[in-house]
């Protein structure tokens, strides 16, 4: 029997209402007012939580010469990776301000750290939930640091093999972590319908014995509707 997990008075697990997290991430582009506006939009839409990213660029980028090409507002943009991440990096006081805004709107504030220092920052904020990035599922020291906090943790599994998910779950539990949620995720943007693979949700639940969520990168609402048949 899977034990429900309590997140700020909201239950996640069998029989509980769907817990909806709105992904803000770094989509505020470093604009604090835009981040506040996105919190309000998420609250007005009925979300339970919003998620940000907290990081220091120097913790995961070692050079400033790498460039990144992406699509923004329908246009292809190429720029320095360092400059892009620095522009979107939120200072501690801004994160604290956003957390207070979430509390006023009855939203769970949570965030994705990229280092142990980022985990400690969220602990100081009194975070009620932590989450990794799929690209950090194989960063076992970070997962152990998250587990050691005792805070409920979401591990996203995009791009991972089953063996890598096994390793991450064992690392979390061996480090004392108890309240674990896994996210079924396909790291394609957008995800083609043929790659959504909702049948992986009951398979993960049976293997790991914990609540399984869905990180959806597909277009439209079809996958969100179809998930009902995958969890019932």
Ranges and model annotations:
Residues 1-232:
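Catalytic cores and adjacent flexible loops of soluble metabolic enzymes
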């Amino acid at each position: 029997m899977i034990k429900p997990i309590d997140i700020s008075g909201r239950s996640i697990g069998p029989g509980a209402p769907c817990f909806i997290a709105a992904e803000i991430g770094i989509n505020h582009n470093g604009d604090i007012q835009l981040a506040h506006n996105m919190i309000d939009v998420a609250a007005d839409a009925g979300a339970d939580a919003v998620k940000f990213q907290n990081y220091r660029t120097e913790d995961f980028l070692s050079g400033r010469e790498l460039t990144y090409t992406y699509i923004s507002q329908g246009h292809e943009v190429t720029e320095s990776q360092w400059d892009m991440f620095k522009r979107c990096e939120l200072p501690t006081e801004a994160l604290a301000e956003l957390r207070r805004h979430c509390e006023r709107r009855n939203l769970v504030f949570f965030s994705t750290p990229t280092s142990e220092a980022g985990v400690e920052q969220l602990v100081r904020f009194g975070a009620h939930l932590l989450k990794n990035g799929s690209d950090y599922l194989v960063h076992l020291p970070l997962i152990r640091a998250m587990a050691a906090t005792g805070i409920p943790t979401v591990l996203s599994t995009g791009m991972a093999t089953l063996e890598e998910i096994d390793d991450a779950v064992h690392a979390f539990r061996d480090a004392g972590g108890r309240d674990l949620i896994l996210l079924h995720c396909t790291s394609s943007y957008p995800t083609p319908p043929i790659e959504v693979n909702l049948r992986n949700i009951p398979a993960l639940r049976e293997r790991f014995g914990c609540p399984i969520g869905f990180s959806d990168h597909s277009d439209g609402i079809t996958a969100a509707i179809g998930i009902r048949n995958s969890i019932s």
